[in-house]
């Protein structure tokens, strides 16, 4: 298993941050990493997500929503072809801290193909997470 973890403090409520994270139709306006997202934010829903990691070609996949708790957590599982080949569990967790919200944004990768991917794609994904986090912070903190 490989894990990418990022965290950012946002001077906004968890409610505001959740509102931005769950409004998929606005992603093309502000999100430099997840450039398109479609589907319902509810457990069991199938999403259509297009990511654009820095320096890499965009990729579209159809993950399954595992957890959707407003103002707390959004989690989905994406798979390459069949379970266990290459899986990615993408997690957004929101933690309210007084007037600020801490966003924990991570992904757990697993599967038999994982050793073949090397560090390049995972580094690009980390950079994409950090760019998305910064853009989310900017949008949430705007008046």
Label each PLM-derived region with a short phrase:
Residues 58-60, 85-89, 113-119:
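A short, polar/proline- and glycine-enriched secondary-structure boundary/capping micro-motif
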Residues 9-13, 50-52, 95-97, 106-110:
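Solvent-exposed residues in well-ordered beta-strands and their adjoining turns
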Residues 63, 76, 90, 104-107:
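Polar/charged side chains located within well-ordered beta-strands of beta-rich proteins
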Residues 1-42:
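Hydrophobic ligand-binding cavity/cleft-lining segments
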Residues 38-83, 97, 134-143:
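Glycine-rich portal/gate segments that line the openings of hydrophobic small-molecule binding cavities
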Residues 102, 108-143:
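A conserved amphipathic terminal alpha-helix motif
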Residues 6-8, 61-67, 88-96:
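Hydrophobic/aromatic beta-strand elements that line small-molecule binding cavities or substrate pockets
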